[in-house]
């Protein structure tokens, strides 16, 4: 049975969270769009294999919209890691496996490096290290124009499966419509420079598994492959592109379970 509720943390964030199962903790950190419904099917599949799975909407996004502006502006990996630790504290999650894609990937690596006593292992997918002007420049547009542009980008360029993306439903897409401007103004200019992957020695030997999308153009995240290889971090592929938990939830859940089991 899944718990769906809210909880507040001392930093002023009221988090919407979901939790299912019993066993070792697995935490699924959303990408920059902040919407945990993307993990809906995978949560149950992972929990069924003997884990307690927790996920949440990110500060300022979707059902965690009640949050101080500083938690969703000039966002960095390190800030996000501190916010995630605050909700783990509130939920009494002391030691967890963490997954994250995009800004979530930066977050889980920052958690692994900054809070090693709290993290069993981390899985990161398509971690952004480069400024992309065509995304950063949307910040100056009106909200509606930002949402229109980014909805098209997500569906047609990076979803990895347009049918699965659309199938998330009207309520999810209505929340994403509101999240796109928050992301455009708070994430693209500050997340890539904060990527916690510059110190290769700091990554070496850490319980970290790295993936990119099998259908993502190689040049998009080639730097991920190079960095992981140089640091001796396991690098692999997941089907689809930027959102494997939406396009291929069964394969994603299996990957999370099997990777976590290696570290128990």
From Swiss-Prot:
Lactonohydrolase that specifically hydrolyzes and deactivates the mycotoxin zearalenone (ZEN) and its zearalenol (ZOL) derivatives. ZHD101 prefers ZEN to ZOL as its substrate, but ZOL, especially the alpha-form, shows higher estrogenic toxicity than ZEN. Its EC number is 3.1.1.-. The active site is at 102, 126, 242. SUPFAM superfamilies: alpha/beta-Hydrolases. Changing residue 183 to F: Almost completely abolishes the catalytic activity. Belongs to the AB hydrolase superfamily. Hydrolase RutD family. The keyword Hydrolase applies. This is Zearalenone hydrolase. Zearalenone binds at residues 32, 102-103, 183, 187, 220, 242. The gene is zhd101.
């Amino acid at each position: 049975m899944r718990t769906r509720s809210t909880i507040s943390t001392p930093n002023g964030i009221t988090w919407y969270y979901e939790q299912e199962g019993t066993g070792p903790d697995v935490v699924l950190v959303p990408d920059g769009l902040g919407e945990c419904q993307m993990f809906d099917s995978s949560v149950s599949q992972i929990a069924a294999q003997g884990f307690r799975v927790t996920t949440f909407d990110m500060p300022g996004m979707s059902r965690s919209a009640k949050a101080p502006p500083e938690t969703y502006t000039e966002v960095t990996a390190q800030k996000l890691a501190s916010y995630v630790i605050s909700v783990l504290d509130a939920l009494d999650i002391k030691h967890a496996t963490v997954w994250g894609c995009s800004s979530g990937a930066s977050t889980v690596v920052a958690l692994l490096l900054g809070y090693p006593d709290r993290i069993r292992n981390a899985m990161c997918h398509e971690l952004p290290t480069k400024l992309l002007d065509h995304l950063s420049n949307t910040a100056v547009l009106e909200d509606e124009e930002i949402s229109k542009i980014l909805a098209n980008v997500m569906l047609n360029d990076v979803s990895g499966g347009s049918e699965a993306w659309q199938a998330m439903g009207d309520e999810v897409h209505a929340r994403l419509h509101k999240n796109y401007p928050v992301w455009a103004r708070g994430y693209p200019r500050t997340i890539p420079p904060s990527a916690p992957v510059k110190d290769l020695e700091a990554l070496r030997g850490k319980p970290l598994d790295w993936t990119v999308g099998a259908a993502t153009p190689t040049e998009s995240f080639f730097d991920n492959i190079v960095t992981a290889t140089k640091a001796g971090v396991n690098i692999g592929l997941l089907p689809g592109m930027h959102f494997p938990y939406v396009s291929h939830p069964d394969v994603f859940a299996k990957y999370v379970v099997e990777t976590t089991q290696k570290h128990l």
